[in-house]
């Protein structure tokens, strides 16, 4: 794992975006096209803002959505489809973007997306880490073993409180209890993982990811077993590392 510690969130976002864009260009040069995964949440603001500015032939890129709440409208402020359309998809010209639809039958949606992603080996996965150490919406204890590319998952209280704290919902009761998430194994199949984790509120999760045991209780700790992961931190998120 390559660990890069920046002085600020903006510097972190720029470095992560430049690194990721270079890997996308390499995939296009080698294969004629690239397949990527894109994450959401407050931790990805700076990275995505810089990524759309990079010199990439986006018309050769197919992108996949990491996760989505079950049961909220695409127009809801917390919808990850809305987030990605506004911050990423509408700013570039992708070959294709495969959204997770949380308003349809969730198990059928998992099967639909699983069939598509199985035909698109992922070159670069842009991900983050939650305050509870989750990877995508795989909250602890995460399922490290399932081969299913997408899962219906239950969101734990700490995860739901993080979403409330970031301002996506008006009350804790408004935060959905379930979501569709890409599985840990599917994320780990990615050729390269770019993990962007700013902010002091992520410091405990970063410490657990890097210094504890690799465990389903700290889902992101499994990134240490991936051959090519870049972990981008800032001074605050790295402040508890020894």
Briefly describe each language-model feature range.
Residues 1-36, 107:
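N-terminal glycine-/serine-/threonine-rich phosphate-binding loop
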Residues 136-182:
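Class I SAM-dependent methyltransferase SAM-binding "motif I" and its flanking Rossmann-like core
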Residues 120-145:
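Glycine-rich phosphate-binding loop
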Residues 35, 123-124, 192:
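Structural motif
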Residues 182-185, 189-242:
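ATP/nucleoside-binding phosphotransfer catalytic cores, i.e., glycine-rich phosphate-binding loops
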